[in-house]
From Swiss-Prot:
Induction: Expression is up-regulated during the late stage of P.nodorum wheat leaf infection and is controlled by the cluster specific transporter elcR. This is O-methyltransferase elcB. O-methyltransferase; part of the gene cluster that mediates the biosynthesis of elsinochrome C, a perelyenequinone phytotoxin structurally similar to cercosporin. The first step of elsinochrome C biosynthesis is performed by the polyketide synthase elcA which catalyzes the formation of nor-toralactone. Pathway: Secondary metabolite biosynthesis. Its EC number is 2.1.1.-. Keywords: Methyltransferase, S-adenosyl-L-methionine, Transferase. S-adenosyl-L-methionine binds at residue 269. Belongs to the class I-like SAM-binding methyltransferase superfamily. Cation-independent O-methyltransferase family. COMT subfamily. PROSITE patterns: SAM_OMT_II (PS51683). It is an enzyme of class 2 (transferase).
């Protein structure tokens, strides 16, 4: 794009944001699209007028921000800064300790770390040698779930990423969750989820559970995009049973149950997870939201005599797994499905090149994150179709719905029937509100 085209895109997006305030019915949809366009155009503008040499040099320094964040999270520097007012680097150095490493960082190092963080927008400078919270850093104190996500990314995923070349040298392009950069980083041939289930891994498991809540509350992964993003849940027949596969403590099912009273829900997950979910399910929904201990690699309960429509819903599950294991998760669902049933996957659909650059990059960021930690992957629509083809020639994608409220997870609806032909990604498989790109 030329400079004039980019500035025109920014001007139009800004105007659309103003218009959103005058259109209450479609405000969230207009605002989401306008913000995406504005951020994408702004990033393209910066990229277009930075020399290739300088761009490469800047790119090579990006790991420094994560290294700084790693230290901040490990030593809990954000908790040493008061919610209101400011504190000196010397005072912070006196406060901070970690449970596994008592002791203090020198004032000079605390200052260097916080000054670096302030340079990329985390914290804000006060008087000389003092620091205060800004909106972003304060969230690390007030939102423990988001704090857990940032900690895991900086102190678990970041060290794993550094071991990716060694993991490839050692294991090749493995499909096994125990042969990952993460396993190399901890010096053990064990999967991340297996590690979490070990007695001394429970703290990390709890942190992971909080992190999943943190990334699902607000922003791109908010559950509200599933509930209020325009997917036609209201068109499902009265009494439809929605089976939330790997549904954790049931937060998505509970949110859907509140909005759509004609639907029933069954949350499936590991024993300890569903026990927790059942205990914490709101009393007024307990007659419509049930919990079942179920390994998603195992066959589904027999429901041939059940006349209800059954929707198998899996959110953020398949991306944790390589194609080998993702197929093993989908297969029992496909075997259980009848022509009136549906499978809905709430997953990232990696866009084709040349769409909004920000969206494309974030999709590939997540793809590498899955590779490093689990040997999982994010998938294009063609990859989902290929996975279904391997599992069952009767399983086909019907529609891909992109929430009108924004968000980065699509809802992929699939069904089984007697048809042997399959729609391609270039057909009318996307909903009317979705660009094919």
């Amino acid at each position: 794009m030329s400079l004039l085209q980019l500035t025109a895109s920014i001007t139009k997006a800004a105007a659309d944001l103003d218009d959103a305030t005058n259109n209450a019915a479609k405000a969230s949809e207009i605002e989401s699209k306008a913000k995406t366009a504005l951020l994408d155009a702004a990033e393209r503008l910066v990229l277009a007028y930075r020399s290739p040499r300088q761009w490469l040099i800047d790119l090579s320094f990006q790991h420094c921000a994560t290294a700084s964040l790693q230290m901040i999270m490990k030593y809990r520097l954000h908790h040493a800064v008061p919610k209101q007012g400011s504190r000196s680097f010397a005072e912070i150095a006196e406060i901070i300790t970690t449970p596994d490493q008592p002791g203090k960082l020198p004032e000079s190092l605390v200052g260097r770390l916080l000054q670096h963080a302030m340079s990329f927008g985390l914290f804000t400078p006060a008087a000389s040698g003092r620091v205060a919270h800004n909106d972003a850093s304060l969230l690390l104190v007030t939102d423990p779930d988001l704090e857990a996500w940032v900690y895991l990314c900086s102190n678990v995923a970041y060290p794993a990423g550094a071991q990716l070349p060694k993991a490839i040298e050692q294991y090749g392009a493995s499909s096994e969750p125990s042969e990952t950069a993460y396993s190399v980083s901890i010096g053990r041939r064990i999967s991340q989820f297996e590690r979490f289930r070990e007695p001394d891994g429970h703290a990390e498991h709890e942190m992971f559970a909080r992190a999943m809540k943190g990334i699902s509350a607000g922003g791109a992964y908010d559950v509200g995009h599933v509930v209020d993003g325009g997917y036609p849940w209201h068109e499902l027949p009265e009494g439809t049973l929605v089976v939330d596969v790997g549904g954790g403590p049931g937060h998505v099912a509970i949110a859907l149950a509140r909005k759509y009273p004609q639907l029933l829900f069954e949350v499936q997950d590991l024993v300890e997870t569903v026990e927790f979910g059942a205990k914490n399910c709101p009393k007024d929904l307990q007659h419509r939201v049930s919990f079942r201990a179920q390994d998603f690699f195992k066959p589904q309960p027999q429901r041939e005599t059940d006349s209800r429509t059954i929707v198998y819903f899996a959110r953020f599950i398949l991306h944790d797994w390589s194609d080998k294991y993702a197929g093993q998760i989908v297969e029992p669902l496909a075997q259980a499905m009848r022509p009136q049933d549906r499978l809905i996957l709430n997953e990232v659909v990696v866009p084709e090149p040349s769409v909004e650059q920000r969206i494309e990059r974030k999709s590939h960021d997540r793809d590498l994150l899955m590779l490093m930690n689990l040997n999982g992957r994010e998938r294009t629509l063609v990859a989902f179709e290929g996975l279904f083809e391997v599992v069952s020639p009767r399983l086909r994608v019907e529609k891909v719905h992109k929430p009108t409220t924004g968000g980065e997870l699509s809802l992929i609806t699939a069904s089984v029937d007697k048809l042997t032909g399959r729609k391609s990604a270039g057909g009318d498989i996307f909903g009317a509100n979705v660009d094919e790109a």
